[in-house]
Amino acid sequence: VLLALVGCGSATVGGGGSPARAKWVGSVVRTPDGGQLRTTIYYGPWQCSAAFLVRCESKCAAQGYPLMGCMWLADIKGDWQGRYLFMPAEAGGRLAITHCCCDYPKVSDGKWRRDTWKNSRNAFRDEWGREFGGWPSTGGVNWQGHHIFDLRHGGAPVARDNVLPVPDDVHGVLNREYPACYAPGGQWLKPGPERPYVD
């Protein structure tokens, strides 16, 4: 279920570092197998680990672009409880949400991409909420939908694996840091720790 959310993620293990910038704990959702799933999202951004940087470098090179930087945006943690072979069981895992800032050209249809998101976001949030337990909000105001592969460089406006709910303050940080990730020689090209935050 979680792997369908973001195809560019990878499994991570919680660990050291400072607390995440923000955290969202979803409500319990029933799974098709009769179990229960709770989703938790930990928000950065953090510098990518050396392994993530190598993976991003390969991804960019395969598309014919140099890597300018890599941002580790969030970790999505899933905790499942149910039954396996008629016995109670628990399982879980984490998925790192990263963005490879390849030296993509800026697109000319940015307005169309923004308008497409604006016109589709309510339906997108409803669909996301059915799977993960409600689109996050604060004081009745929905959190922003952050485009992992940004619209300015060609990201898909309503692709399931390209939009992540983020609180307003984190969204502001991400929007400030994305241009730095695409700029040459910045901090986002330097490797960070394997586990940048604590639960």
Outline where the language-model segments fall.
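Bacterial N-terminal signal peptides
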Residues: 1-7
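Nuclease and nuclease-like effector domains acting on nucleic acids or nucleotide cofactors
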Residues: 8-144, 149-199
